[in-house]
């Protein structure tokens, strides 16, 4: 039996460079959570899209080549697109989509394409995948002054007596 080993690939590898992925390690499962998610000029839209899709394809190819049983892809609630005003919440099966003609949708459309790749690899190679459409990750690399509400709340708590909530309170998650 192969043993389940834990490894943070980001410490040793670059998912955009297939050759940098581990050679002598044995994995039964992969958690693919590598994505640049900041908004703004730090990463051009085409590069953001390519990194999501190409990185996912490399991870899937690696999984097939190394007989990995299952992959967990962290996707994004952004794949649903904007929440229609007529919906109080978005059901998981909702088939909305961000505007594919808007370059600002590169992250969300890239995540949707990554999900589709997982489906194709399941059909072609039998690679089981689970997709988690997450939002609001919190960790040491979270920008405290960007477009992430939780980061802004943490910044305000650390540097002010008041926590500012931007918006009208209508969004529900």
Where do the protein language model's features map onto the residues?
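Single conserved hydrophobic/aromatic residue that forms the stacking wall/gate
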Residues: 1-9
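Small-residue (primarily alanine) positions within well-ordered alpha-helices
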Residues: 5, 34-35, 63, 114
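NAD(P)H-binding glycine-rich loop region in Rossmannoid oxidoreductase-like domains
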Residues: 15-51
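SDR active-site strand-loop-helix element
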Residues: 30-36, 71-77, 132-134
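Helix N-cap/beta-alpha junction loops of NAD(P)-dependent oxidoreductase domains
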Residues: 37-40, 82-83, 140
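A conserved pocket-lining segment of Rossmann-fold NAD(P)-dependent short-chain dehydrogenase/reductase
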Residues: 41-42, 95-102, 129-143, 152-173
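Catalytic helix-loop patch of NAD(P)-dependent Rossmann-fold dehydrogenases
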Residues: 46-58, 65, 70, 79, ...
């Amino acid at each position: 039996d192969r043993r389940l080993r834990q490894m943070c690939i980001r410490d040793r590898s670059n998912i955009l460079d297939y050759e940098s992925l581990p050679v002598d390690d044995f994995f039964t499962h992969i958690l693919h959570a590598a994505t640049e998610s900041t908004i703004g000029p730090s990463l051009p839209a085409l590069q953001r899209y390519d990194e999501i899709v190409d990185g996912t394809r490399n991870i899937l190819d690696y999984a097939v080549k190394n007989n990995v049983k299952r992959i967990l892809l962290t996707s994004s609630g952004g794949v649903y697109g904007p929440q229609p005003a007529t919906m109080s919440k978005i059901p998981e099966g909702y088939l909305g989509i961000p505007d594919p003609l808007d370059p600002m949708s590169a992250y969300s459309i890239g995540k949707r394409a990554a999900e589709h790749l997982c489906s194709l690899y399941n059909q072609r190679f039998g690679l089981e995948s689970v997709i988690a459409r997450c939002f609001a990750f919190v960790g040491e690399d979270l920008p405290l002054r960007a477009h992430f509400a939780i980061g802004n709340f943490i910044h305000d708590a650390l540097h002010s007596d008041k926590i500012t909530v931007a918006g009208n309170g209508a969004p529900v998650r």
